């Protein structure tokens, strides 16, 4: 990652401090521009829904937030701390992998295809990260994992393996796993896109419950009804840029930009 100049200090603080700040994010793959100078702030405890067509940069933005993708320029801060980089003589330098892993432990990530360990039970999938990071003993981690599985409605499936679970159940295990390290921010990358339609509701119900917990959520989804009901703010991306941003009542019900209106007319 090339070094980039630090931005000037921000002005007056928001009512709620920023949990996530994206500053001038640029990213391309093979000459294809995927993120084109995105600036974004997500307040602590906010639920942000990110909408946009395929290829608009939604997943890349999420992956950049926890440094699964290195930006070509710009940087991301979580809780005021640069992610994946450090300040060095007025510029940014890449952190070592061990430091990056520590930072990622504070950012939950729920993938669209579950990414569970197939050889571990639901219980051990949830307990794995706290043990691996030294945050808990195996007994402590398993006790908390049982509580988290109960929270997502799967206490009775604790000893089941992923192959024995439906897609919706696997995704709920993945959400419990994301909660195991008690992150301040959780990223959801189209968490219902791989599910049969009848299973979508059970996963959205868990995310709705999380939305009331005070955890900052950033959710990439095409579930417009969910966005209307749960989101504090909606961002519409197209061509790697923020086209429109605001409360659901504005972006979804009275969008200002023609591209937003065109997109919504196709998905509603």
Residue ranges and their predicted role:
Residues 180-184:
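A short, proline-enriched helix->beta-strand linker immediately N-terminal to the Walker B motif
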Residues 245-246:
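ABC ATPase "signature
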Residues 120-128:
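Short coil-to-helix segment of the ABC ATPase nucleotide-binding domain corresponding to the Q-loop/switch region
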Residues 186-189:
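Catalytic Walker B motif of ABC-type/P-loop ATPase nucleotide-binding domains
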Residues 161-165, 169:
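Conserved ABC ATPase signature
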């Amino acid at each position: 990652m090339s070094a980039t100049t630090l931005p000037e200090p921000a002005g007056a603080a928001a009512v709620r401090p920023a949990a996530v700040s994206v500053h001038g994010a640029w990213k391309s793959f093979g000459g294809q521009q995927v993120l084109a100078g995105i600036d974004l702030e997500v307040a602590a405890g906010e639920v942000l829904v990110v909408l946009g067509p395929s290829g608009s940069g939604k997943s890349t933005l999420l992956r950049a937030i926890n440094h699964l993708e290195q930006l070509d320029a710009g940087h991301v801060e979580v809780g005021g701390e640069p992610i994946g980089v450090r300040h060095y003589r007025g510029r940014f330098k890449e952190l070592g992998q061990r430091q990056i892993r520590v930072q990622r432990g504070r950012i939950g990530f729920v993938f669209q295809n579950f990414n569970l360990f197939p050889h571990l039970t639901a219980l051990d999938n949830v307990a794995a990260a706290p043990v691996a990071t030294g945050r808990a003993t195996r007994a402590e981690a398993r006790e908390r994992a049982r509580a988290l599985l109960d929270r997502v409605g799967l206490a009775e499936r604790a000893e089941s393996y992923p192959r024995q679970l439906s897609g919706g159940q696997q995704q709920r295990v993945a959400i419990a796993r994301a909660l195991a390290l008690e992150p301040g921010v959780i990223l959801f990358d189209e968490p219902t896109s791989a599910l049969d339609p009848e299973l979508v509701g059970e996963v959205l119900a868990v995310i709705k419950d999380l939305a009331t917990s005070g955890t900052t959520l950033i959710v990439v989804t095409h579930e417009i009804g969910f966005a209307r009901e749960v989101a504090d703010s909606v961002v519409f991306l197209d061509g790697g840029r923020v086209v429109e941003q605001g409360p659901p009542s504005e972006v979804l019900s009275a969008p200002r930009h023609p591209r937003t209106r065109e997109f919504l007319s196709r998905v509603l």
